[in-house]
Amino acid sequence: MIQMQSTLDVACNSGARRVQCIKVLGGSHRRYAGIGDIIKVSVKEAIPRAKAKKGDVYNAVVVRTKKGVRRPDGSVIRFDRNAAVLLNNNLQPIGTRIFGPVTRELRSEQFMKIVSLAPEVL
């Protein structure tokens, strides 16, 4: 469950290390975002000479949450940290690599690129 002011790790090689959620997209009063939801983020920490700089604002898709996701069979998949992948204006990933596992819930038409780049799909 990600809300405004939540900080997330970045799970791609765009150059950003930590981002902060500044808006949950998808409705005028939407409060929380879960896995597969798009949020607006500000880069808080970045590596030198990278594409993403500190202070830049991007769209991002949430790929891992501490809250986790409940499957229809009753199982729950949770993670230790919240993580997101930075997206460009066309909602395509900025980075060319994805770090760490992602969930099967991202297998929509929109995020198949992220699923195919991920080392593990849970």
Curated annotation (Swiss-Prot):
Keywords, comma-separated and alphabetical: Ribonucleoprotein, Ribosomal protein, RNA-binding, rRNA-binding
Q: Which InterPro entries match?
A: Ribosomal_uL14 (IPR000218), Ribosomal_uL14_bac-type (IPR005745), Ribosomal_uL14_CS (IPR019972), Ribosomal_uL14_sf (IPR036853)
> Is rRNA-binding one of the keywords UniProt gives this record?
yes
PANTHER family to which the protein is assigned, alphabetical:
50S/60S RIBOSOMAL PROTEIN L14/L23, LARGE RIBOSOMAL SUBUNIT PROTEIN UL14M
The family classification in the record reads:
Belongs to the universal ribosomal protein uL14 family.
Can you tell which superkingdom this protein's organism belongs to?
A: Bacteria
Q: Which GO terms describe its molecular function?
A: large ribosomal subunit rRNA binding; structural constituent of ribosome
Could you state one GO biological process linked to this protein? translation
Q: Which gene encodes it?
A: rplN
User: Oligomeric state and partners?
Assistant: Part of the 50S ribosomal subunit. Forms a cluster with proteins L3 and L19. In the 70S ribosome, L14 and L19 interact and together make contacts with the 16S rRNA in bridges B5 and B8.
Q: What does this protein do?
A: Binds to 23S rRNA. Forms part of two intersubunit bridges in the 70S ribosome.
> Which Pfam families does the record match to this protein?
Ribosomal_L14
Q: What is this protein called?
A: Large ribosomal subunit protein uL14
Task: Return the GO cellular component terms, semicolon-separated.
Answer: cytosolic large ribosomal subunit
Note the HAMAP family from the entry: Ribosomal_uL14
